[in-house]
């Protein structure tokens, strides 16, 4: 299979008003995951297309597209994950989601309202879903928890791996809000998360 890219995809608008409205709702209700995706869609611009362009330059990326590998399907197959070696990423991930009582499809429903996802070609959609479904794998690799500070630090780390204006906005607002409660050390923790690949523990 040969993957082709549009030479210059139309530039998607940045919708700050929409993002700020969603952010106000998210601050009032931090569990409103759908607002996270509203902010990401409002501010991402062409981040997804840029990430996909990088993805298809790698051998592994092209292999994933050829094989139509769904990360979500793999993560949902707990029987298979349980057969893999004890200290593998699969085993660590399975232990994490079991302990936290969460499932891999937890972000699917909140992301379904994103208009931009509805018009993607099959390859870009597979990549976009893979980006979404990486979240709990990043938790596993970095050992950041699902508490507020852990999530903010994980967002900062994710921004370093996949630059995205929407994720950065959520992370910065989260850092500011947490610093009012816990002090300026929150800034240092988030900055370390952003810059330090040694946080990956496996």
Please tell me what each predicted stretch does.
Residues 35-38, 65-69, 105-112, 149-153, ...:
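Short coil/turn segments at secondary-structure boundaries
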Residues 123-189:
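Conserved binding-pocket/active-site segment within a compact domain
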Residues 16-19, 36, 48, 86-90, ...:
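Short runs of predominantly hydrophobic/aromatic residues within well-ordered alpha helices
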Residues 10-17, 24-28, 56, 99, ...:
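Mature, well-folded catalytic/scaffold domains that follow N-terminal targeting or propeptide regions
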Residues 31, 35, 63-64, 101, ...:
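Residue-level signal for secondary-structure boundary elements
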Residues 200-202:
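Conserved small/polar residues in nucleotide/adenosyl-binding loops
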Residues 1-79:
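The feature captures two recurrent sequence modes
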Residues 59-139:
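Long acidic/polar interaction regions in large eukaryotic complex-forming proteins
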């Amino acid at each position: 299979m040969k993957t082709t890219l549009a030479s210059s995809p139309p530039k998607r608008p940045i919708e700050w008003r929409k993002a700020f409205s969603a952010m106000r709702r998210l601050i009032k209700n931090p569990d409103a995951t759908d607002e996270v995706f509203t902010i990401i869609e409002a501010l991402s611009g062409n981040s997804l297309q840029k990430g996909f362009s990088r993805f298809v330059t790698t051998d592994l990326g092209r292999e994933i597209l050829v094989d139509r590998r769904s990360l979500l399907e793999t993560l949902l197959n707990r029987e298979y994950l349980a057969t893999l070696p004890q200290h593998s990423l699969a085993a660590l991930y399975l232990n994490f989601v079991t302990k936290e009582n969460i499932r891999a499809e937890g972000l699917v429903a909140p992301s379904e309202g994103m208009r931009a996802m509805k018009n993607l070609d099959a390859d870009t959609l597979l990549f976009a879903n893979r980006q979404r479904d990486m979240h709990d794998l990043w938790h596993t690799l970095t050992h950041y928890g699902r508490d507020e500070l852990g999530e903010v630090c994980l967002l900062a780390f994710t921004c370093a791996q996949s630059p995205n204006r929407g994720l950065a906005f959520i992370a910065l607002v989260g850092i500011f809000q947490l610093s009012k409660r816990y002090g300026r050390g929150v800034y240092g923790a988030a900055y370390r998360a952003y810059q330090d690949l040694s946080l990956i523990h496996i």
